[in-house]
């Protein structure tokens, strides 16, 4: 992809699905899936106060999730710029079950299995560091355009 920083996209309401939903493959273009972690925050995050600890205190709950992409690239590799231009997320998210914030330094694995085949995995990820490591970047990046990372 040739990206040297985190990517961001917009998740529209109609693209947010709950666990157990049945989606039609015909509604997507060459669908691909990734295992991810998502968080819901309990307050708006003031970019001037943003720090790792401030963000950690702002987490209400954690979700394993499936990120759905339309795996279509029209240009030549590397495709990072095209990925960003097409909104990164592309096609939606399926939220798994809600998890409360665990104790610090908890190690976890996340695996996405589809049709009995391992599609994606995260191994030995440490809470909160591996899951929240890029949120500070996102908060400050959104602040450049006067967008506040909010809890709504």
List where the protein language model places each region.
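A conserved acidic, glycine/proline-rich C-terminal tail/linker
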Residues: 131-152
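Catalytic-core "active-site belt" of small-molecule-metabolizing enzymes
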Residues: 1-130, 144-145
């Amino acid at each position: 992809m040739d990206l040297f920083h985190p990517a961001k996209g917009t998740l529209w309401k109609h693209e947010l699905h709950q666990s157990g939903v049945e989606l039609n493959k015909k509604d997507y273009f060459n669908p691909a899936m990734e295992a991810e972690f998502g968080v819901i925050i309990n307050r708006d995050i003031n970019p001037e106060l943003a720090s790792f600890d401030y963000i950690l205190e702002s987490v209400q709950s954690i979700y394993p999730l499936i990120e759905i992409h339309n795996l279509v690239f029209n240009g030549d590799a590397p495709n990072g710029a095209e990925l960003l231009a097409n909104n990164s997320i592309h096609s939606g998210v399926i939220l798994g079950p809600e998890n409360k914030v665990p104790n610090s330094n908890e190690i976890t694995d996340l695996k996405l299995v589809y049709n009995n085949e391992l599609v994606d995995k995260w191994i030995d990820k440490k809470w909160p560091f591996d899951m929240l490591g890029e949120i500070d970047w996102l908060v400050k990046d959104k602040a450049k355009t006067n967008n506040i990372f909010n809890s709504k």
